[in-house]
Amino acid sequence: EPSSLEFGGIVKNKLRTIRSPFSVNLEITPVCNLRCGFCFAESECQLHHPSFGHICRIIDELARAEVFEIRLFGGEFFTYPHWDRVIEYADNKGMFLTFVSNGTLITSEKVAVLTRHGVKSGAISIHGPEDAHDAITGMKGSYQKAMRGLEACLGGGVYITVLTTITQTNKNKI
């Protein structure tokens, strides 16, 4: 496994020869388990997940185009029933993977799958203190679940960027 300095060199070399996008955001599913008022994602009962085969064809195309990084997101990435197979498939294609999540479905077992396939970083949405976060996401208890997911990631060696959307509800609490 390369050190941070070596990894920086790998990235610089890749950028010198790049003929395609360096990074691609790939929406794995439009489905989400939360109901944030500002978000375009839909609740679980309204939409369907794309097939695993469809996602694999997209990953194949990105690999052929020599895309370096795929950022996996949704909706909520972890609502996708085959999220672990997607991670494994993309890893086997040599893709560098990150993810975006609301954190509520992340467990230490899921983090173990992520790290087994080289996922070292991701992003989790935290929209302020507990009361504001729960109000924004439309689900009481979502803050506590997101924090447990964040802690599972950090405990398992996955670095996390915290994403915050500023709204009227949290603007004075950030």
Q: What is each stretch, according to the model?
A:
Residues E1-S121:
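Conserved alpha-helical substructure of the radical SAM core
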Residues N33, F77-T79, G103-S108, A123-K140, ...:
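Conserved radical SAM core fold
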Residues C45, S101, D131-A132, T161:
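Residue-level signal for pocket-adjacent positions within structured domains
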Residues H49, M139-Y143:
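Short, conserved loop/turn and helix-capping segments at secondary-structure boundaries
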Residues H54-I58, V86, K110, S142-A152, ...:
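A general structural detector for well-ordered alpha-helical segments in enzyme core domains, enriched
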Residues F99, I124, V162-T164:
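Structural beta-sheet core signal
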Residues S121-A132, L150-Y159:
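Short, basic, helix/turn surface patches
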Residues G149-K173:
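Conserved strand-turn element in the central/C-terminal portion of the radical SAM core barrel
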